[in-house]
Regions:
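Bacterial N-terminal signal peptides
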Residues: 12-24
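Sec/Tat signal peptide C-region and signal peptidase I cleavage site
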Residues: 25-31
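Bacterial N-terminal signal peptides that target proteins for export
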Residues: 2-15
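Interaction/scaffold regions that mediate signaling and macromolecular assembly across diverse proteins
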Residues: 32-275
Length: 275
């Protein structure tokens, strides 16, 4: 694959996180293109159940291969800013599925590019498998250099799915710019409220049990405000009115990290685990 190359600077819209959601400030750009994620949307509807993936079905689907070819040929900088964010989230999730299938992995994504018990230098997230607009990216490039650096949008962490049971569930539809705000809010609520093994609030003990996504992985905590209290305030908006929301908003709690399950998020593994 071709090495990652730097793009020439291009005026980009500014994506700001407003309390109520995604705020887009338009830049003086030329006429904007569109990218149809309908193929990926149909595949997600067909082959994702309760956030779990039928990897064999994606591997066997010629439509998926055709969708990846379209990603590889398309220049996303021609899109509006909200469409760019949706495009890159969909690209990340699609190429994660492709990475797993390219290596015929069915146990854990962490087994990819691993030998003698150690992940080799580039690991699964740095393999230049994801081609967009003629440039090869690693999944890390998409997450760290494009989505996180260019967009002040913490909710992307609820949408990017790294092929593990411990991740937020893979959404059964593609992300699209004109519904992105609502989709990200819904993902946040699903991850926070419907996965007690990952996130839950213990009112009596004044303890918030949180996924490592919030408090351990990389420097993600800074995306949510930089402290455990700030994380609580951020996620409180996704809770219904009541004692849990009040405790989170107060910042007067202690945090305990929940275990992170790196088992592949496949439907077959979910059945074996009785999920």
């Amino acid at each position: 694959m071709r090495a990652l190359r730097r793009h020439a600077a291009r005026p980009l819209a500014i994506l700001a996180l407003a309390l109520g959601g995604l705020t887009v400030v338009a830049s003086p750009a030329a006429a904007q293109a569109e990218f149809d994620h309908g193929t990926f949307d149909a595949l997600l509807h067909a082959h994702v159940r309760n956030g779990m993936v039928d990897y064999d079905a994606f591997a066997a689907a010629p439509e998926f291969a055709a969708y990846l070819k379209r990603l590889a040929a398309f220049d996303p900088t021609t899109l509006s800013q909200s469409d760019q964010v949706a495009f890159w989230i969909d690209a990340y999730n699609a190429y994660t599925i492709q990475l797993v299938n390219a290596h015929h992995e069915r146990e854990s994504i962490r087994n990819i590019n691993k030998s003698f018990g150690f992940i080799r230098g580039y690991g699964p997230w740095k393999e230049k498998l994801a081609v967009v607009g003629g440039t090869a990216y690693g999944l890390d490039d998409i997450e760290q250099d494009i989505l996180r650096k260019r967009n002040r949008e913490p909710r992307i962490h609820f949408a990017l799915v790294c092929a593990a049971m411990g991740c937020p569930p893979l959404r059964g539809e593609a992300y699209v710019g004109n519904r992105l705000d609502a989709q990200l809010d819904d993902q946040a609520r699903t991850f926070l409220l419907a996965s007690p093994g990952k996130n839950r609030v213990d009112i009596a003990a004044k303890t918030v049990h949180l996924s490592p996504i919030f408090v351990e992985f990389r420097d993600y905590i800074h995306d949510f405000g930089g402290s455990e209290a700030a994380v609580g305030r951020f996620i409180s908006r996704f809770y219904p009115a009541g004692a849990e929301r009040d405790l989170l908003a107060s910042g007067q709690f202690r945090v305990e990290k929940t275990p992170y399950d790196w088992t592949l998020n496949s439907q077959a593994n979910a059945r074996r685990a009785g999920r």
